[in-house]
Amino acid sequence: MSVDFNTLAKQFCEFYYQTFDTDRSQLGNLYRDHSMLTFTGTQHQGAQAIVEKLVGLPFGQVRHKISDIDAQPASAQGGDVIVLVTGELCVDGDNPLPYAQVFHLIPDGSSYYVFNDIFRLNA
């Protein structure tokens, strides 16, 4: 499978953060039962547990401002991609907080799912 990782990473991040910022409950289709989220040091496994964590975050209005997106192939066999995102997280109108997030994207037919998702505030 030939992948333009930079285009894939950009399109994925635009979709992910737009969905996160408007309705986090709709992110479940991006994960599988074996997917894992590490959110500021706490691990959550499976699509349902991940969405429960994201929906349960203690803020209302949120906006991600992406600074940089870097992508690389994750294996020589092809298809999967590692994505590193850095930016600022604006929550409920407070001062922006710097963050980093890593996604490991795995091909699934004509689309991709998130196998690993690691989020860390850099404050």
UniProtKB/Swiss-Prot annotation:
Its main location: cytoplasm. One of its GO terms (biological process) is protein import into nucleus. One of its GO terms (cellular component) is cytoplasm. CDD domains: NTF2. GO terms for molecular function: nuclear import signal receptor activity; small GTPase binding. Transmembrane segments: none annotated. It is found in: Cytoplasm. Keywords: Cytoplasm, Protein transport, Transport. Residues 8-121 form the NTF2 domain. The keyword Repeat does not apply. The keyword Protein transport applies. Facilitates protein transport into the nucleus. Could be part of a multicomponent system of cytosolic factors that assemble at the pore complex during nuclear import. PANTHER family: NUCLEAR TRANSPORT FACTOR 2. This is Nuclear transport factor 2.
